[in-house]
Amino acid sequence: VMAEIACRALSPAVNDPGTAIDVIGRGVRILSTYAQNKSDEIEVKYPSVHVAPLQNNDLLEDFFSPVARDGAGMREIQIRVLKGLSMLSKGWPGIFSEAAHNLAFETLEHAIRADHIDSDRCLIKSIYYNLFSGEDSNKKP
């Protein structure tokens, strides 16, 4: 739902990147709270009811992918997405690192393909490399 709010704010009819940036920040805080409280030891209260466990990759993809895609033409959105992914990756590497790296690269690809002026494209690339290069040498550049 939060990604939908951010995407709606980025639509041409609304064109409100400030709301999308606010939603990205809130999403990062929610995912951080989830990571802080995540436990492998779960008390089963209702053994007859089965609920599939949350997948960390899905949590990040469901939130960040649509926002990065719909905000591809706005440098402030791309930068905020990269910073949010970096915070989650560095704050909880065992939970979010792999998905955050993959989504950061996807965000960079969206930015490169978007119609940015050269200085914006260089800024986004620079931020990506500053935040994500060196963390995991097996990831795409």
Where is each model-derived feature located?
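Short basic (Lys/Arg) and small-residue
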Residues: 1-141
